[in-house]
């Protein structure tokens, strides 16, 4: 998979270069000046401005490999524009709002310093970001229901195999 970047602080249990490359604002600005940023989103969080981005940093070799990227609809559209429609296959994983909130709360409770206000802000922002209108605008039709992890993964693997 492609490892994205973020300027947000690392959470407990995360490792640099695994979930994200964790960088500061200065490094983001340098990469922007070097024209290495493919797409980015900045959020005015309860803890300050956090930026998430994908960079053309040498880890993407489309002629040799296929990749899995986790992102927003906005990032999907930007990547599709950058790399082309023919190489992008959206895998939209849908989670019922109550379950999504419950999972987020469980993850936040596990932190030494839980950021509940930020959890609430992000939950509401995600509801807007992943609205029906935005899904339709991005051309995302196929959805995978994340109720049972194993079933969801099997369906996604079948879809990936069809598109290879």
Model-derived regions, located:
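Conserved catalytic segments around the Walker B and adjacent sensor/switch elements
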Residues: 2-4
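ATP-dependent small-molecule kinase phosphotransfer cores
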Residues: 6-67, 71-73
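Conserved catalytic network of the ASCE P-loop NTPase/AAA+ motor domain
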Residues: 12-13, 58-63, 81-86, 134-137
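Conserved AAA+ ATPase "sensor/coupling" helix adjacent to the nucleotide-binding pocket
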Residues: 34-38, 106-111, 159-162
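C-terminal accessory "lid"/substrate-recognition subdomains
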Residues: 63, 157-164
């Amino acid at each position: 998979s492609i490892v994205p970047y973020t300027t947000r602080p690392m959470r407990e249990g995360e490792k640099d270069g695994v979930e994200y490359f964790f960088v500061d604002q200065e490094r983001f600005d340098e990469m922007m000046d070097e024209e290495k940023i493919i797409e980015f989103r900045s959020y005015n969080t309860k803890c300050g401005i956090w930026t998430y981005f994908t960079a053309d940093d040498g880890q993407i070799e489309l002629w040799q490999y296929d990749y899995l990227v986790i992102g927003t609809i906005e990032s999907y559209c930007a990547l599709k524009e950058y790399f082309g429609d023919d190489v992008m296959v959206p895998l939209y994983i849908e989670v019922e709002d109550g379950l999504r909130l419950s999972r987020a709360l469980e993850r936040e409770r596990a932190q030494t310093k839980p950021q509940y206000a930020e959890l609430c802000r992000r939950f509401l922002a995600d509801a807007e970001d992943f609205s029906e209108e935005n899904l339709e605008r991005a051309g995302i039709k196929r959805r995978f229901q994340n109720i049972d992890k194993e079933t969801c993964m099997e369906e996604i693997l079948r879809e990936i195999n069809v598109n290879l």
